[in-house]
Amino acid sequence: MNDLRYPIGQFTYKRPITEEMIDTWIQEIEDLPNELTKAIKDLDQKQLDTPYRVGGWTVRQVVHHVVDSHMNSYIRFKLALTEKNPTIKPYKEEKWAELPDSKLPVDVSLVMLESLHKRWVNLLYSLELEDLEKTFNHPDTGETKLAAAIGLYAWHGRHHTAHITSLRKRLNW
């Protein structure tokens, strides 16, 4: 049986990272607001409040989480571009998913995601090769180059979109 937590597999990439890989990843980040919107199209409130797996987040929580995560990533990129290997602040995703704003209509987060990704993609397309080598330090996972972080967040968006699309397929929605 497939691992419902990782419907597209865990994040991996081949090295070295090429300009073509970066361009593909940025395009995936740019496409995410539309892809996520399509994934939840025509779902009713009961469906939005259905966990994508036993013990997992609801579809609604997944949508809000993507925005929380990508806001954090955008800030991490800006820190890495303006400071030398800054140590970023992790956050407790599972606790954020329980806060009251995670019960808001998904449209609230979809609007945020659209705006956030316009700014983030603009920033990403402006990066020079030397910028892609800049890093931030995560207290738990260590140093991350911006080039790899672009791939990670492209995967992250596809990963959570697949949580929703695979749930829809399993339940024939």
Curated annotation (Swiss-Prot):
UniProt superkingdom: Bacteria
Subcellular location(s) of the protein: Cytoplasm
A GO cellular component entry from the record: cytoplasm
Broad class of where this protein is predominantly found: cytoplasm
Entry EC no(s): 3.-.-.-
Keyword rRNA-binding: no
Record-level Gene Ontology MF annotations: hydrolase activity; zinc ion binding
Binding locations of Zn(2+): 65, 156, 160
Cofactor: Zn(2+)
UniProt keyword list: Cytoplasm, Hydrolase, Metal-binding, Zinc
Cofactor note: Binds 1 zinc ion per subunit.
One Pfam assignment: DinB_2
Role played: Possible metal-dependent hydrolase.
Subunit comment: Homodimer.
Stated family: Belongs to the metal hydrolase YfiT family.
Name of this chain's protein: Putative metal-dependent hydrolase BA_2700/GBAA_2700/BAS2515
Originating species: Bacillus anthracis
Biological classification of the source: Bacteria, Bacillati, Bacillota, Bacilli, Bacillales
